[in-house]
Amino acid sequence: MAFSNPFDDPQGAFYILRNAQGQFSLWPQQCVLPAGWDIVCQPQSQASCQQWLEAHWRTLTPTNFTQLQEAQ
């Protein structure tokens, strides 16, 4: 089955990106990388990316919000 949206393709190759707030994103290899995001892992399968995220992403809370809470 062909996927019109590259973000939905389970057979696609994806980068793992991270922004300044410590949030992660899967990004299709064939798409232009967004500004403000750094490559954490080179393109790999969606399943491999999900395994990496499960092992490394501990919170959904952005870094700036966590720092604000700790300061109070």
From Swiss-Prot:
Q: Which GO terms describe its cellular component?
A: cytosol
> What processes in GO biological process is this protein linked to?
enterobactin biosynthetic process; siderophore biosynthetic process
**Keywords noted in UniProt:** Enterobactin biosynthesis
User: Is-annotated flag, keyword Transcription regulation?
Assistant: no
Q: Which Pfam families match?
A: MbtH
Q: Which InterPro entries match?
A: MbtH-like_dom, MbtH-like_sf, MLP_fam
What happens without the gene?
A: Cells lacking this gene are not able to produce enough enterobactin for efficient growth.
The Swiss-Prot or TrEMBL record describes its family as follows: Belongs to the MbtH-like family.
Functional note: Involved in the biosynthesis of the siderophore enterobactin (enterochelin), which is a macrocyclic trimeric lactone of N-(2,3-dihydroxybenzoyl)-serine. Plays a role in the catalytic function of EntF. It is required for adenylation of amino acids in non-ribosomal peptide biosynthesis.
Q: What is this protein called?
A: Enterobactin biosynthesis protein YbdZ
Gene designation: ybdZ
